[in-house]
Amino acid sequence: MPELLVFPAQTDLHEHPLYRAGHLILQDRASCLPAMLLDPRQAPMSWMPVPPQAIKTSHLAALLKNQGKIFAFDLDARRLASMATLLAWAGVSCCELAEEDFLAVSPLDPRYREVHYVLLDPSCSGSGMPSRQLEEPGAGTPSPVRLHALAGFQQRALCHALTFPSLQRLVYSMCSLCQEENEDMVQDALQQNPGAFRLAPALPARPHRGLSTFPGAEHCLRASPKTTLSGGFFVAVIERVEMPTSASQAKASAPERTPSPAPKRKKRAKSCSRCLHTALHIAEAPGSLLPGGKGRCLSSPWKTLGPHRRQQFAF
């Protein structure tokens, strides 16, 4: 990740002038993975981080070079106002904030029909966050009741995100170490959409993979304080399965039909063929990503956001 600077774990840069000026932002290295794995540099399309988080949204905007469109939703007006302030401080101008419930957003809404990428980071137990475990003893092992409630919301959010018609790639991320919130959620979503989506290998060179709970779980990625010297994190990259890219391919896979001799019927069939060709042509969005280093890191994504920003600094 060339936009990141890595520092020793105990480095305190909160008072550094570059940080205070908005040129740099403190971020756990593992939390940088979702935006990178979404691979937004492929094309300036429409993006949707759910729920909106200033750090991850800013990272997306930087990778997009402030192009395209990012939609972010939150029902809490105060959180949205705070996020708007932070995004403005970072120089982000391609994000549109909406005080809406993501689960109530219609995938057929003209505003969101062309959303191609979704970064889904719903509420979770936070069992992978070392700071929470220090502040709340026992936070690393949430109760079954709380896990069940969280998993229900995560399942609804993930399944809803997969219904957007133009979706090409979704990154599901959790700052949790619990299988119920991680591998189980991904397996359930794939089972509910058989043949429509698949897991893409996330940084296959990295040794720390998803738990072997279902075939393909090794494509998921895990991080933890013990294994990667970072916060605990889970990431899965879900891609839409490619459909035929031409009307002839689609016709070959469809049941054979006897054409009608009526001229009008022939004309309608030709028109439908053109529509089918357009609907089935889906652009690929392959990713080529490299693992980061060890330790705490400082993200400097805003160097690409405007002429008033500075280049990346090393210490």
Curated annotation (Swiss-Prot):
E.C. numbers: 2.1.1.-
Tissue expression pattern: Ubiquitous.
GO biological process, one term: RNA methylation
Listed name of the protein: Putative methyltransferase NSUN5C
Organism: Homo sapiens
Ligand binding (S-adenosyl-L-methionine): 50-56, 74, 79, 121
Gene field: NSUN5P2
Similarity annotation: Belongs to the class I-like SAM-binding methyltransferase superfamily. RsmB/NOP family.
Function, as annotated: May have S-adenosyl-L-methionine-dependent methyl-transferase activity.
Region (Disordered): 245-269
Enzyme class: transferase
UniProt disease annotation: NSUN5C is located in the Williams-Beuren syndrome (WBS) critical region. WBS results from a hemizygous deletion of several genes on chromosome 7q11.23, thought to arise as a consequence of unequal crossing over between highly homologous low-copy repeat sequences flanking the deleted region.
Single Gene Ontology MF annotation: RNA methyltransferase activity
